[in-house]
Amino acid sequence: MSGYFFTGFPGFICQELVRELLSTKQNVTNIFLLVLPAQKSMSVPIIHTYQQQFPSTTFHLVEGDITQPNLNMNKEDQQLVQEQTNYVYHLAAIYDLAVKREIAFQVNVIGTKQVLEWVKKLTNLKRLIYFSTAYVSGKREGKIRETELIHEASFKNHYEETKYLAEILVDREKEQLPITIIRPGIVKGHSQTGETTKFDGPYLMLNFLHSLRFLPLIPHLGKGEAEFNVVPIDYIVKSTCYLTHSERAQGKTLHLTNPEPISIREAYTVLMEKFLKKAPTGSIPLPLAKTFLRVPTARKWLKVEREALDYYTWRGSFDCREARRILDDADINCPSFHLTADMMVKYYNEHKYDQMKHIHIS
């Protein structure tokens, strides 16, 4: 009999993590989902679906705000959650490469600090799972290990910087709290269905190709030699559910990254061939592409964030051997990009005109 508390609902990873947990774990008594008041109405239909699929579990939509003391929960919810929670998943964050620093700092850093202070009050806590990102490495290059965190390199954007600062806060509590830190790579849709809620991350390539589909020749963007570390959502949630209950994962920081990543150039070529049935021709110098994307009209037309191009020249590589040592026991493996590209393109094709799927480009 266990209770699980989640921040970050109704975000994509959180939704899929709840579903995976209930599909694989017995005796889940209570699921507590912290939501901002403005997001409660959109969360209710999702909860109804959960209730139909998993009638033996009680679901609680709890209004709150991670940036406030006690997560801004009312006293009644606070008491119930404290009594019934054994596992906490902190996923709430600003996932936006173009976010302003003040906003990212408030949610990613202050929010994480408030979650940590609140978690210390839980008397029945068995594990805190904190979702960081592999890209807390910032502009570090070379092999990046799971045991490494502190560095003096700068960052490509405020998202990376504030997630780095937040992870430092969590890492400092490892001796006091039962913590596992998850560092995902770039998350994409389900490997078997292609399903995703937002066309961000690797889908920006498809946005770019869709906008230029009428051109007889479409070039590469720069040399594209950087590593493209993309992982499907099903690998992320299966791994996380297993690691939650693994004693070997307690106190660890783990890269949920692709152990066999491909280059950006190769990924771009694969997606173009599957999406447009043509191969790239030539190359546009990356500085020229960045200059073009300084124009808001160009960014909105292409549906591409300018900050995404910073990853085209980054020379880092993620070592995920510690995660693999633990996950190998459960035979949980990351599918290759080549094996999942067909479903990714198929799903994008079916939903490319759905504006709710596209992220806001300013």
PLM region spans:
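Amphipathic terminal alpha-helices
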Residues: 12, 28, 319-362
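Conserved Rossmann-fold NAD(P)-dependent oxidoreductase catalytic core, especially the SDR/UDP-sugar
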Residues: 90, 98, 102-103, 110-158, ...
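Active-site Tyr-X1-5-Lys
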Residues: 154-185
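Glycine/proline-rich active-site loop of Rossmann-fold NAD(P)-dependent oxidoreductases
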Residues: 190-203, 243-254
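Mid/C-terminal beta-alpha module of Rossmann-like enzyme folds, strongest
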Residues: 242-305, 325, 348, 352, ...
